[in-house]
Amino acid sequence: MNEQGEAINSSAESRIQLESSWKAHVGNWLLRPEMRDLSSFLRARKVAGVSVYPPGSQIFAAFEATPFQRVKAVILGQDPYHGQGQAHGLCFSVRPGMPLPPSLLNIYKELEEDLGLLRPDHGCLLPWANRGVLLLNAVLTVEDGRAGAHQGKGWEGFTDHVVDTLNREREGLVFMLWGSYAQAKGKVIDTRRHLVLKAPHPSPLSAHRGFLGCRHFSLCNQYLSQHGLGMVDWSLPPCIALDGAILNGRIAV
Protein backbone atom coordinates (compact mmCIF):
# COMPACT_ATOMS: atom_id res chain seq x y z
CA MET A 1 0.00 0.00 0.00
CA ASN A 2 1.26 3.51 -0.69
CA GLU A 3 0.35 7.08 0.13
CA GLN A 4 -2.46 6.98 -2.42
CA GLY A 5 -4.25 4.18 -0.57
CA GLU A 6 -3.46 1.72 -3.33
CA ALA A 7 -3.03 -2.05 -3.31
CA ILE A 8 -0.68 -4.09 -5.43
CA ASN A 9 -2.49 -5.92 -8.21
CA SER A 10 -1.70 -9.57 -7.60
CA SER A 11 -2.20 -10.51 -11.26
CA ALA A 12 -0.64 -7.56 -13.10
CA GLU A 13 1.83 -4.77 -12.63
CA SER A 14 -0.81 -2.08 -12.25
CA ARG A 15 -2.10 -0.67 -8.98
CA ILE A 16 -5.67 -0.23 -7.87
CA GLN A 17 -7.24 2.30 -5.58
CA LEU A 18 -9.77 2.10 -2.79
CA GLU A 19 -13.08 3.70 -3.80
CA SER A 20 -13.00 7.43 -3.01
CA SER A 21 -15.67 7.59 -0.29
CA TRP A 22 -14.07 4.69 1.55
CA LYS A 23 -10.62 6.20 1.12
CA ALA A 24 -11.87 9.33 2.87
CA HIS A 25 -13.06 7.30 5.87
CA VAL A 26 -10.57 4.41 6.17
CA GLY A 27 -7.77 5.17 3.71
CA ASN A 28 -5.31 6.28 6.39
CA TRP A 29 -5.23 2.71 7.69
CA LEU A 30 -3.54 1.66 4.45
CA LEU A 31 -0.51 3.75 5.44
CA ARG A 32 0.20 1.62 8.49
CA PRO A 33 3.36 -0.54 8.56
CA GLU A 34 1.39 -3.80 8.61
CA MET A 35 -0.34 -2.83 5.37
CA ARG A 36 2.99 -2.06 3.72
CA ASP A 37 4.14 -5.49 4.89
CA LEU A 38 1.00 -7.00 3.38
CA SER A 39 1.69 -5.28 0.07
CA SER A 40 5.23 -6.69 0.06
CA PHE A 41 3.87 -10.16 0.88
CA LEU A 42 1.38 -10.05 -2.01
CA ARG A 43 4.08 -8.86 -4.38
CA ALA A 44 6.41 -11.66 -3.27
CA ARG A 45 3.73 -14.31 -3.78
CA LYS A 46 3.12 -12.99 -7.29
CA VAL A 47 6.83 -13.10 -8.09
CA ALA A 48 6.90 -16.68 -6.79
CA GLY A 49 4.24 -17.62 -9.34
CA VAL A 50 1.47 -18.24 -6.81
CA SER A 51 -2.12 -17.74 -7.98
CA VAL A 52 -3.80 -15.25 -5.66
CA TYR A 53 -7.57 -14.70 -5.70
CA PRO A 54 -9.42 -12.55 -6.45
CA PRO A 55 -7.54 -10.77 -9.24
CA GLY A 56 -5.89 -7.58 -8.04
CA SER A 57 -8.43 -5.29 -9.66
CA GLN A 58 -11.19 -6.95 -7.61
CA ILE A 59 -9.56 -7.03 -4.16
CA PHE A 60 -11.51 -3.91 -3.15
CA ALA A 61 -14.63 -4.77 -5.19
CA ALA A 62 -16.92 -4.73 -2.15
CA PHE A 63 -16.05 -1.08 -1.53
CA GLU A 64 -16.34 -0.18 -5.22
CA ALA A 65 -19.82 -1.69 -5.43
CA THR A 66 -21.10 -0.20 -2.15
CA PRO A 67 -19.80 3.31 -1.38
CA PHE A 68 -19.66 4.35 2.27
CA GLN A 69 -22.83 6.44 2.45
CA ARG A 70 -24.86 3.87 0.50
CA VAL A 71 -24.31 1.03 2.98
CA LYS A 72 -27.55 -0.24 4.51
CA ALA A 73 -26.54 -3.73 5.59
CA VAL A 74 -23.29 -5.63 6.09
CA ILE A 75 -22.72 -9.35 5.60
CA LEU A 76 -19.38 -10.53 6.96
CA GLY A 77 -17.48 -13.46 5.49
CA GLN A 78 -14.10 -14.96 6.36
CA ASP A 79 -11.92 -15.15 3.26
CA PRO A 80 -12.47 -15.52 -0.51
CA TYR A 81 -13.25 -18.79 -2.25
CA HIS A 82 -9.98 -20.49 -3.14
CA GLY A 83 -11.00 -22.22 -6.37
CA GLN A 84 -9.98 -20.88 -9.77
CA GLY A 85 -12.49 -18.41 -11.18
CA GLN A 86 -14.73 -18.26 -8.11
CA ALA A 87 -13.78 -15.17 -6.08
CA HIS A 88 -14.49 -11.68 -7.34
CA GLY A 89 -14.25 -9.59 -4.20
CA LEU A 90 -17.72 -10.03 -2.66
CA CYS A 91 -18.21 -12.45 0.23
CA PHE A 92 -20.29 -15.57 -0.49
CA SER A 93 -20.58 -14.50 -4.16
CA VAL A 94 -19.16 -16.23 -7.23
CA ARG A 95 -18.85 -15.07 -10.79
CA PRO A 96 -21.70 -15.85 -13.20
CA GLY A 97 -21.29 -19.30 -14.71
CA MET A 98 -19.54 -20.81 -11.69
CA PRO A 99 -21.21 -23.65 -9.74
CA LEU A 100 -23.02 -22.52 -6.60
CA PRO A 101 -20.98 -23.19 -3.43
CA PRO A 102 -22.85 -25.12 -0.70
CA SER A 103 -23.05 -22.13 1.67
CA LEU A 104 -24.57 -19.97 -1.03
CA LEU A 105 -27.11 -22.67 -1.82
CA ASN A 106 -28.24 -22.53 1.80
CA ILE A 107 -28.41 -18.72 1.66
CA TYR A 108 -30.72 -19.08 -1.33
CA LYS A 109 -32.81 -21.68 0.52
CA GLU A 110 -33.30 -19.25 3.40
CA LEU A 111 -34.06 -16.41 0.99
CA GLU A 112 -36.81 -18.50 -0.61
CA GLU A 113 -38.25 -19.62 2.73
CA ASP A 114 -38.12 -16.12 4.23
CA LEU A 115 -39.21 -13.94 1.32
CA GLY A 116 -40.54 -16.39 -1.26
CA LEU A 117 -37.81 -15.49 -3.76
CA LEU A 118 -36.90 -18.30 -6.13
CA ARG A 119 -33.28 -19.39 -6.38
CA PRO A 120 -31.49 -17.65 -9.24
CA ASP A 121 -29.50 -19.57 -11.84
CA HIS A 122 -26.17 -18.03 -10.79
CA GLY A 123 -24.22 -17.10 -7.67
CA CYS A 124 -23.37 -13.46 -8.41
CA LEU A 125 -24.50 -11.22 -5.53
CA LEU A 126 -23.36 -7.99 -7.16
CA PRO A 127 -26.96 -6.69 -7.40
CA TRP A 128 -27.16 -6.86 -3.59
CA ALA A 129 -23.92 -4.90 -3.31
CA ASN A 130 -25.20 -2.26 -5.71
CA ARG A 131 -28.32 -1.89 -3.55
CA GLY A 132 -26.42 -1.18 -0.34
CA VAL A 133 -25.32 -4.55 1.05
CA LEU A 134 -21.61 -4.49 1.87
CA LEU A 135 -20.37 -8.03 1.20
CA LEU A 136 -17.16 -7.91 3.20
CA ASN A 137 -14.66 -10.69 3.81
CA ALA A 138 -12.38 -10.33 6.84
CA VAL A 139 -9.43 -11.35 4.67
CA LEU A 140 -9.47 -10.01 1.12
CA THR A 141 -7.09 -12.41 -0.64
CA VAL A 142 -6.38 -16.14 -0.70
CA GLU A 143 -4.19 -18.58 -2.64
CA ASP A 144 -5.28 -21.25 -5.08
CA GLY A 145 -6.44 -24.33 -3.18
CA ARG A 146 -5.31 -22.98 0.20
CA ALA A 147 -8.20 -21.71 2.31
CA GLY A 148 -7.02 -19.22 4.91
CA ALA A 149 -3.58 -18.84 3.33
CA HIS A 150 -3.55 -15.07 3.89
CA GLN A 151 -5.01 -15.00 7.38
CA GLY A 152 -2.80 -13.15 9.82
CA LYS A 153 -1.04 -11.18 7.07
CA GLY A 154 -2.68 -7.83 7.82
CA TRP A 155 -6.11 -7.80 6.22
CA GLU A 156 -7.95 -8.43 9.50
CA GLY A 157 -6.79 -5.15 11.03
CA PHE A 158 -8.00 -3.22 8.00
CA THR A 159 -11.41 -4.87 7.87
CA ASP A 160 -11.79 -4.53 11.66
CA HIS A 161 -11.23 -0.81 11.09
CA VAL A 162 -13.89 -0.80 8.36
CA VAL A 163 -16.44 -2.40 10.70
CA ASP A 164 -15.53 -0.05 13.55
CA THR A 165 -15.77 3.00 11.28
CA LEU A 166 -19.23 2.01 10.08
CA ASN A 167 -20.23 1.41 13.69
CA ARG A 168 -19.07 4.87 14.79
CA GLU A 169 -19.86 7.04 11.79
CA ARG A 170 -23.13 5.56 10.54
CA GLU A 171 -26.38 4.79 12.33
CA GLY A 172 -29.27 2.40 11.73
CA LEU A 173 -27.31 -0.24 9.80
CA VAL A 174 -27.97 -3.99 9.88
CA PHE A 175 -25.04 -6.33 10.50
CA MET A 176 -25.71 -9.95 9.51
CA LEU A 177 -23.20 -12.14 11.34
CA TRP A 178 -23.25 -15.78 10.31
CA GLY A 179 -20.99 -18.07 12.30
CA SER A 180 -18.65 -17.60 15.24
CA TYR A 181 -15.91 -15.94 13.20
CA ALA A 182 -18.18 -13.15 11.95
CA GLN A 183 -19.77 -12.76 15.37
CA ALA A 184 -16.38 -12.30 17.02
CA LYS A 185 -15.46 -9.68 14.44
CA GLY A 186 -18.73 -7.87 15.12
CA LYS A 187 -18.30 -7.58 18.88
CA VAL A 188 -17.44 -3.87 18.52
CA ILE A 189 -20.85 -3.04 17.05
CA ASP A 190 -23.02 -0.85 19.26
CA THR A 191 -26.43 -2.52 19.36
CA ARG A 192 -28.00 0.76 20.50
CA ARG A 193 -27.11 2.29 17.12
CA HIS A 194 -27.43 -0.71 14.82
CA LEU A 195 -29.23 -4.03 14.46
CA VAL A 196 -27.01 -7.09 14.86
CA LEU A 197 -28.48 -10.34 13.53
CA LYS A 198 -26.66 -13.54 14.51
CA ALA A 199 -27.04 -17.08 13.20
CA PRO A 200 -24.87 -20.13 12.57
CA HIS A 201 -22.83 -20.18 9.37
CA PRO A 202 -24.77 -21.24 6.23
CA SER A 203 -22.28 -24.06 5.62
CA PRO A 204 -23.94 -27.49 5.32
CA LEU A 205 -22.10 -28.40 8.53
CA SER A 206 -24.03 -25.83 10.57
CA ALA A 207 -26.93 -24.35 8.59
CA HIS A 208 -29.45 -26.74 10.19
CA ARG A 209 -28.50 -25.44 13.65
CA GLY A 210 -30.32 -22.17 13.13
CA PHE A 211 -29.28 -20.45 9.92
CA LEU A 212 -32.15 -22.04 8.04
CA GLY A 213 -35.21 -20.37 9.47
CA CYS A 214 -33.39 -17.31 10.86
CA ARG A 215 -35.43 -14.89 8.68
CA HIS A 216 -32.58 -12.40 8.57
CA PHE A 217 -33.59 -10.96 5.21
CA SER A 218 -37.07 -9.94 6.34
CA LEU A 219 -35.80 -8.82 9.76
CA CYS A 220 -33.24 -6.63 8.02
CA ASN A 221 -35.88 -4.95 5.90
CA GLN A 222 -38.22 -4.49 8.83
CA TYR A 223 -35.50 -2.63 10.74
CA LEU A 224 -34.40 -0.56 7.74
CA SER A 225 -37.98 0.46 7.06
CA GLN A 226 -38.43 1.54 10.67
CA HIS A 227 -35.24 3.62 10.54
CA GLY A 228 -35.88 5.32 7.23
CA LEU A 229 -33.05 3.84 5.16
CA GLY A 230 -35.27 2.02 2.68
CA MET A 231 -35.56 -1.73 2.36
CA VAL A 232 -33.11 -3.89 0.40
CA ASP A 233 -34.42 -5.57 -2.73
CA TRP A 234 -33.09 -9.09 -2.11
CA SER A 235 -34.25 -10.45 -5.46
CA LEU A 236 -31.62 -11.47 -7.99
CA PRO A 237 -32.21 -11.33 -11.75
CA PRO A 238 -31.55 -14.38 -13.93
CA CYS A 239 -28.04 -14.65 -15.28
CA ILE A 240 -29.09 -13.55 -18.75
CA ALA A 241 -30.48 -10.30 -17.28
CA LEU A 242 -27.38 -9.32 -15.31
CA ASP A 243 -25.93 -6.02 -16.45
CA GLY A 244 -23.28 -6.99 -18.99
CA ALA A 245 -21.59 -3.62 -18.73
CA ILE A 246 -21.06 -4.17 -15.01
CA LEU A 247 -20.13 -7.82 -15.30
CA ASN A 248 -17.47 -7.03 -17.89
CA GLY A 249 -15.97 -4.36 -15.65
CA ARG A 250 -13.54 -4.47 -12.78
CA ILE A 251 -16.00 -5.64 -10.14
CA ALA A 252 -17.49 -8.91 -11.27
CA VAL A 253 -15.18 -10.69 -13.72
Curated annotation (Swiss-Prot):
Compartments annotated for it: namely: Cytoplasm
Q: Which residues form the active site?
A: 79
EC primary class = hydrolase
Main localisation = cytoplasm
Q: Which domain of life is it from?
A: Bacteria
Protein name as annotated: Uracil-DNA glycosylase
The gene name on file is ung
Question: What intrachain disulfides are recorded?
Answer: none
Q: Name the reaction it catalyses.
A: Hydrolyzes single-stranded DNA or mismatched double-stranded DNA and polynucleotides, releasing free uracil
Q: What is its EC number?
A: 3.2.2.27
- Protein keywords: Cytoplasm, DNA damage, DNA repair, Hydrolase
